Regions:
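Nucleotide/phosphate-binding catalytic cleft detector across ATP-hydrolyzing
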Residues: 1-165, 173-322
Length: 322
């Protein structure tokens, strides 16, 4: 019996959603066993060598709060690997944690990847997973995985649409007969909304806030359409004029204004996907095409409220006028 075969006896098959904001690990027979931020904290020594200090939730708490010799890094950007070595370290940590720290574990892994990923980016994910301890690596396109998980009738001879808004990318796909008929992947999602909120507050109030604060604003009072009540939240940051700490109040209307371009880009991607549908699928009434809107926890509730159509009416994702 070979060493990989022996290692396989100590391993469990895993499915990994390697997201820009969060990484989820699913174990066969147990369901989702890990859901942690895709963040790694590293310490640099005098020679510039890096050492992993923490991964996941503990590392995310360090973002924006570290001294000069410690950095908190997100190795994923726009749905793909931005730092190979750190992504490998993060994957190794999650694999070992999923196997209760067992070093002999060499599992078979299936990883979700964006539909618009290049061969170079796909190879980087495969090599990172193998270096992290995977025995075999398989891929599934994220729109297909999301559609199956959402319960869409992907094997039927009619169109289904999935709109998966994550941290780094938004995946829009039309599926039929077990395959992806057409898909659009845009690098506009939760992270871009955070950046838009930071820039909006910086320009309007001359106040500099961090990405964690922007995410908190988005998930607390963010919205894509006016609600019944105007919500507000206190924001703390650094006054760019005086350089001192400052507190101000921002309301939900301002947040909606700040992320309007990002919301429009996502709606435009949905429209483009519909325009690319084959004529045969277009024979089905639009109202009969099941559309699922999946939103990353780091983006809710900014887009969990209905979006307006072009006439300003409130529409559900299923009946959105595009």
């Amino acid at each position: 019996m070979t060493l990989p075969s022996i290692s396989g006896l100590f391993s469990h098959d895993l499915a990994i959603d390697l997201g820009t904001a969060n990484t989820l690990v699913y174990m066969k027979g147990k369901g989702i066993i890990l859901n942690e931020p895709s963040v790694v904290s590293m310490k640099k020594d005098a020679r510039g060598a890096k050492k992993v200090l923490s991964v996941g939730k503990e590392a995310k708490c360090m973002v924006g709060r570290t001294p000069g010799n410690i950095v908190a890094i997100r190795p994923m950007k726009d749905g793909v690997i931005a730092d190979f070595d750190i992504a490998e370290a993060m994957l190794r940590y999650f694999i070992r944690k999923a196997h209760a720290g067992r070093r002999l574990a060499r599992p078979r892994i299936i990883i979700g990847v964006p539909s618009g990923i290049t061969e170079v980016e796909r190879k980087a994910v495969k090599e990172a997973a193998e270096s992290a301890g995977a025995r075999e690596v398989y891929f599934i396109e994220e729109p297909m995985a999301a559609a199956i998980g959402a319960g869409l009738p992907v094997t039927e001879p009619r169109g289904s649409m999935i709109v998966d808004i994550g941290g780094g990318t938004t995946e829009v796909a039309v599926l039929s007969l077990g395959g992806i008929v057409c898909s659009i992947s845009v690098r506009v999602a939760g992270d871009k909304m955070d950046e838009a909120i930071i820039e909006y507050i910086k320009k309007k109030y001359r106040l500099l806030i961090g990405s964690s604060t922007a995410e908190a604003i988005k998930t607390t009072i963010g919205n894509a359409f006016p609600g019944d009540t105007l919500e507000s939240v206190e924001v703390k940051g650094r006054d760019l004029t005086t350089g001192t700490p400052k507190v101000l109040t921002i309301d939900s209307d301002e947040v909606r204004e700040s992320i309007s371009e990002e919301v429009d880009a996502i709606v435009s991607a949905v429209r483009t996907a519909l325009e690319q549908m084959p004529p045969e699928l277009c024979n089905d009434p639009l109202e009969s095409i099941p559309i699922k809107l999946l939103i990353s926890p780091c983006t809710q509730p900014a887009l969990s409220t209905p979006a307006p159509d072009e006439a300003g009416r409130c529409c559900t994702p299923r009946s959105m006028t595009l």
